[in-house]
Amino acid sequence: MSLLSDLINLNLSDTTEKVIAEYIWIGGSGMDLRSKARTLPGPVSDPSELPKWNYDGSSTGQAPGEDSEAIYTHKPFQDPFRRGNNILVICDAYTPAGEPIPTNKRHAAAKVFSHPDVVAEVPWYGIEQEYTLLQKDIQWPLGWPVGGFPGPQGPYYCGVGADKAFGRDIVDAHYKACIYAGINISGINGEVMPGQWEFQVGPSVGISAGDEIWAARYILERITEIAGVVVSFDPKPIPGDWNGAGAHTNYSTKSMREDGGYEVIKAAIDKLGKKHKEHIAAYGEGNERRLTGRHETADINTFLWGVANRGASVRVGRDTEKAGKGYFEDRRPASNMDPYVVTSMIADTTILWKP
């Protein structure tokens, strides 16, 4: 095993300028990540230098199989697994004719974020990505007794100790790997349900928020693969008196961050309320199991906002209210949401939509 480890950790720059690029794209379910690697002649300083590639969409549930789907490169990150000059590359997928395939949500998001009115507002996002670690063979949360349940919620949120925190080595490895990769990860914490954790990405501007969340999810999938643990983004992995898993999305525009921004925030929240059903429909599959009005959520059928209210659909922080400017938190997105969809939809509703 030591020889295998030595070979995995070879520093290619000792003998060659060649680098390995791992191309990452989203599969047919809209949540499954796929990737494959190719050799490049040397380090890449700009995404435009990365060649387009292709893949068999019939094997990812994305095409009938007569032709190969194309993947276009967008955002490179440093590869924390191969290290050196090797990179991970976030891509999106197209038909051979150049049309975005149905699971390519980045293409439409990029159109929203390139709109001059949106560009002028410099939208910031901070996404709180929750997830649950599962024992591989039984698909049951890490640290839970087989076929049984731990003690009730209370001691696990930000908890410390072998009977409260399960999988911290995975969480910390992921945290450091994201920083190494160049992802703007801003923190981690243990969540209310044991075996559940959260990482935060942001503040990130526009389309980069989606790129960074998907890259962070990919790195987490790779680390749990190594650890022999399954990561679940199900919004309610365990029924009953247990917290679900969300992806609270913090948001601000230039106008909100400036003096008088609180009025802009309230106007934006009013718009979100008027499009509540449309947003809920796009905020993650199975979210109705999570948004019940219990466990720090609002009821899925009701739009409610408030200051410092964790049971609201949209929450405004006390600091924002006091300063008269800042940001707000959309608490509705599920943990399995597509960040391209959620971020662009919030921008579209609050900036571009005219009721």
UniProtKB/Swiss-Prot annotation:
- Name the segments for region: Disordered: 39-67
**Which GO molecular-function terms appear in the entry?**
ATP binding; glutamine synthetase activity
**Major enzyme class:** ligase
Looking at the record, the residues that make up the GS beta-grasp domain are 19-98
Give residue ranges for domain GS catalytic. 105-355
Could you tell me where this protein is found in the cell? Cytoplasm
Matches recorded under Gene3D superfamilies: Glutamine synthetase, N-terminal domain (3.10.20.70), Glutamine synthetase/guanido kinase, catalytic domain (3.30.590.10)
GO CC, alphabetical: cytoplasm
- Provide the reaction this enzyme catalyses: L-glutamate + NH4(+) + ATP = L-glutamine + ADP + phosphate + H(+)
Q: Name one GO biological process term.
A: glutamine biosynthetic process
Keyword line: ATP-binding, Cytoplasm, Ligase, Nitrogen fixation, Nucleotide-binding
User: Which positions carry the signal peptide feature in this UniProt record?
Assistant: none
Top-level taxonomic group: Eukaryota
The answer to keyword ATP-binding applying to this record is: yes
Keyword Cytoplasm on entry: yes
What Pfam families would the database entry show?
Gln-synt_C
User: What's the EC number here?
Assistant: 6.3.1.2
Additional comment: Irreversibly inhibited by the herbicide L-phosphinothricin (PPT).
The family assignment reads: Belongs to the glutamine synthetase family.
Oligomer status and interactors: Homooctamer.
The protein's name is: Glutamine synthetase cytosolic isozyme 1
